[in-house]
Amino acid sequence: MKNVVALILAGGQGTRLGVLTEKIAKPAVQFGGKYRLIDFTMSNCVNSGIYKIGVLTQYKPHLLNRHIGIGKPWDLDRKDGGVTILQPYSTEKVGVWYKGTADAVYSNIEFVDSYSPDYVVILSGDHIYSMDYNELVDYHVAKSALGTVACMEVPLSEANRFGIMVTDLENRIIEFQEKPKFPKSTLASLGIYVFQWNFIREVLMEDAKDENSTHDFGKDIIPKIINTKRVYAFPFEGYWKDVGTIYSYWESNLELTRPIPPFNIHDENWKIYTHSEEMPPAYISDDARVKNSLISEGCEIYGEVYNSVLAQGVEVGEGVIIKNSVVMSRVRIGNNCFIENAIIAENVVIGNEVKIGVGEFVENKLNSRVYNSEISVIGMDSVIEDKVKIGKNCVVGIDKIVSKSLTSGEYI
């Protein structure tokens, strides 16, 4: 790999994930049974031979910091390079929060300078995909580009959620719209950039002085630098998913249970590394039934699990039926429960004879923009007491004790 430093933007709150990110940053949310979202970007880096990595954290970083540690699971505990957690710090002139994605990189110029790189790759820490960044950098070099933006085609109905590009026949970006109401194309930025470091360094320093800038790559930096006529789009044709909503998070997890999933977490040639607890193998009893599901280490299954993803250390009692659900680590489920179309966050305790996901769909009373499907969400460290019924599209916040039933659309 050429002399490259990677910066992973991992400070996002992920407000559209609701209670799932009340205690932790979005990149720290569990995914696929044993992983956290940031694992996919971190693994892409080391699989691409990039071992000089800065992780820029901000919102509730403690679990994320502990998860990454010194980077040992990714072979990043090394003298030359490795991974460095870069949190906002206060000086006499600068506040303690990054003002935007560009300001986050600007605030860590000294870190990048310490490696004297030719190129910097800037990545998001909360997307699901596999990409060889060598191909991205090689494309960038071949084009003699100052900047390159990875992109893919998206449905027109979703284009207003992305930065949208218009390109010429050589893939040169000639226009960039950030989340436009009326998109001029369906070519969307994936939030994956490579820049010549000396070039983007100067751009960021100029942007920092601009009082009218929001200091954001999509809103300010990319639209500004396309005037150089040396900023290109890199077409990406693999699987890429922004699991930024409750539904997309649930759907992307359950896609992994298909016989041939659209995203392969079992690829021996492109492994996904993570920091995980040492747990014994999963135990599935004689009376249990498991079909089309991912069952992680340390699980004990005495009931029935269908089309679901269970993270490490989940206990499923006798007479339990779980369907189309995502259950995060160390959840304990009592006996004779029914759970369907649910996301249950870490360390939740569910009593006996509990039902979750029953009844008819009703619009959510807490936030119908965030919670807008039949999926019910149970926040971290909550307790659902015996015989409680929870309807569809319900929300239980973090650290709650639920002793009374909730009809569809209700919250606590």
Curated annotation (Swiss-Prot):
InterPro entries named among the record's database cross-references: ADP-Glc_PPase (IPR011831), ADP_Glu_pyroP_CS (IPR005836), GlgC_bac (IPR023049), GlmU/GlgC-like_hexapep (IPR056818), NTP_transferase_dom (IPR005835), Nucleotide-diphossugar_trans (IPR029044), Trimer_LpxA-like_sf (IPR011004)
Keyword set includes ATP-binding: yes
Keywords assigned by UniProt, alphabetized: ATP-binding, Carbohydrate metabolism, Glycogen biosynthesis, Glycogen metabolism, Nucleotide-binding, Nucleotidyltransferase, Transferase
Pathway this chain belongs to: Glycan biosynthesis; glycogen biosynthesis
Gene3D superfamilies: Hexapeptide repeat proteins, Spore Coat Polysaccharide Biosynthesis Protein SpsA, Chain A
Disulfide pattern: none
Record's catalysed reaction(s): alpha-D-glucose 1-phosphate + ATP + H(+) = ADP-alpha-D-glucose + diphosphate
Keyword presence, Lipid metabolism: no
Pfam families: Hexapep_GlmU (PF24894), NTP_transferase (PF00483)
EC number(s) on file: 2.7.7.27
Gene Ontology MF, one: ATP binding
Positions annotated to bind alpha-D-glucose 1-phosphate: Y98, G163, E178, K179, S189
BP terms from Gene Ontology: glycogen biosynthetic process
SUPFAM superfamilies, A to Z: Nucleotide-diphospho-sugar transferases, Trimeric LpxA-like enzymes
Domain of life of the native organism: Bacteria
Family (UniProt): Belongs to the bacterial/plant glucose-1-phosphate adenylyltransferase family.
Function: Involved in the biosynthesis of ADP-glucose, a building block required for the elongation reactions to produce glycogen. Catalyzes the reaction between ATP and alpha-D-glucose 1-phosphate (G1P) to produce pyrophosphate and ADP-Glc.
NCBIfam families the UniProt entry points to: glgC, PRK05293.1
Subunit structure as annotated in this protein's UniProt entry: Homotetramer.
Name under which the protein is recorded: Glucose-1-phosphate adenylyltransferase
Origin species: Thermosipho melanesiensis (strain DSM 12029 / CIP 104789 / BI429)
